[in-house]
């Protein structure tokens, strides 16, 4: 299924609006709160020293299909376009900045069911952080239920 939010000039914010409105897909309480926070912080975050940079979010989102391919299943060999929920995760991690232009979020935690492309997403985020963010000595860690799960990255 194509990601309907990537065509929007600010796909992360478009996803957040859709999540809050609840018209396109169901979300849990914590996800809705995160989407509400995103929209609220766009409105008044600058007073608290946080800034939304949609171009930074778009750069990270564009990195995934430009560099990575699907490696398994019927879509093998095709560009790895982020799933719709990836749009909010990746955009939030890389689009929010502090007054000193550092990332607002320095840690991320993802939990979701099987088949949601967590491993490819986390691998892509790790490569992006280590190679494309001008962050010397960048470190990325992936954890899993056990060593075999963590090694999938």
Question: What role is predicted for each listed range?
Answer:
Residues 2-153:
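Phosphate/NTP-binding elements of NTP-utilizing enzymes
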């Amino acid at each position: 299924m194509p990601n309907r939010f990537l065509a929007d000039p600010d796909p992360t914010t478009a996803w957040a609006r859709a999540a809050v409105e609840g018209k396109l897909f169901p979300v849990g309480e914590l996800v809705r709160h995160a989407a509400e926070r995103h929209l609220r912080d766009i409105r008044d975050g600058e007073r608290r020293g946080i800034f939304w940079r949609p171009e930074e979010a778009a750069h990270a989102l564009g990195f995934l299909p430009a560099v990575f391919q699907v490696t398994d299943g019927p879509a093998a060999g095709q560009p790895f376009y982020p799933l719709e929920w990836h749009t909010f995760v990746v955009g939030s991690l890389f689009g929010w900045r502090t007054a000193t232009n550092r990332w607002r979020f320095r840690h991320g935690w993802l939990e979701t069911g099987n088949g949601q492309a967590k491993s490819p997403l986390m691998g892509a985020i790790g490569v992006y952080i280590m190679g494309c963010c001008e962050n010397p000595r960048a470190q990325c860690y992936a954890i899993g239920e056990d060593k075999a799960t963590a090694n999938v990255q």
